[in-house]
């Protein structure tokens, strides 16, 4: 899984969703 700067910006919301589930 590669990580991009754009993903890092959405990492906060993405992490919340992944952590929530």
Swiss-Prot record:
The keyword Secreted is annotated on this UniProt entry: yes
Function summary: Helicopsin exhibits robust neurotoxic activity as shown by immediate death (about 8 minutes) of mice due to respiratory paralysis.
Protein name (record): Helicopsin
GO cellular component, one term: extracellular region
Keywords noted in UniProt: Disulfide bond, Neurotoxin, Secreted, Toxin
Extra remark: Negative results: has no hemorrhagic activity.
Keyword Secreted: yes
Signal peptide stretch: none
Post-translation changes: Contains 8 disulfide bonds.
Family, similarity comment: Belongs to the CRISP family.
Tissue expression as described in the entry: Expressed by the salivary gland.
GO terms assigned for molecular function: toxin activity
UniProt-annotated location(s): Secreted
Domain of life: Eukaryota
